[in-house]
Amino acid sequence: MANYSFTVRAEWDHEAELWYVADSDIPGLAAEAPTTEALLVKLRILIPELVELNRHLISVNIDPYLQIHLMSERIEQMIWY
């Protein structure tokens, strides 16, 4: 159903206790949220808006269906001794 898939890589900011967009193939995408689920809610709003604004930078014919591939990474450090 989805014509085009956008990849968004989210990372955990331990100090701020937030997930944030670390990288994406969508020009201008920036967002943060306390959970990946909350981040996805924001992305569902932001991505269509940015696709419309940046249509001249995205060289594909996009239909009404967009797919979001959200990859998250969280690295924890701990004292083991």
Segments predicted by a language model, with ranges:
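A short, exposed loop/beta-hairpin motif centered on an aromatic-Gly-Thr core
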Residues: P27-A38
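Short aromatic-glycine-(Arg/Gly/Cys) micro-motifs in beta-strand/loop hairpins
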Residues: E11-D25
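Short, charged, surface-exposed hinge/linker loops at domain edges
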Residues: M1-R9, E15, E37-Y81
